[in-house]
Amino acid sequence: MHMIDLKKLVGSKVRIVDIDDITYEGIVDEYIDAEDNVPEEIEAIILTDLLRLDDGKKFINPIEFKATEIISAYSI
């Protein structure tokens, strides 16, 4: 698995594929540095306006994705 620079995605609309091979689209609202993500110490991003493309489910609340849960992430 290659490293994705999650920090560069802040403010972008993105498509993410997670480790369960589920695809999402949303806006990257926030980046959390590994040092600030206690107790996991894993970098993460928080997405808003999230849509799970596999079944069309829309999420009302922001959702956090840890770097270890993301297979691919790119701006769309």
Where are these regions (language model features)?
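Conserved RNA-binding domains used in RNP assembly and mRNA/RNA metabolism
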Residues: 2-76
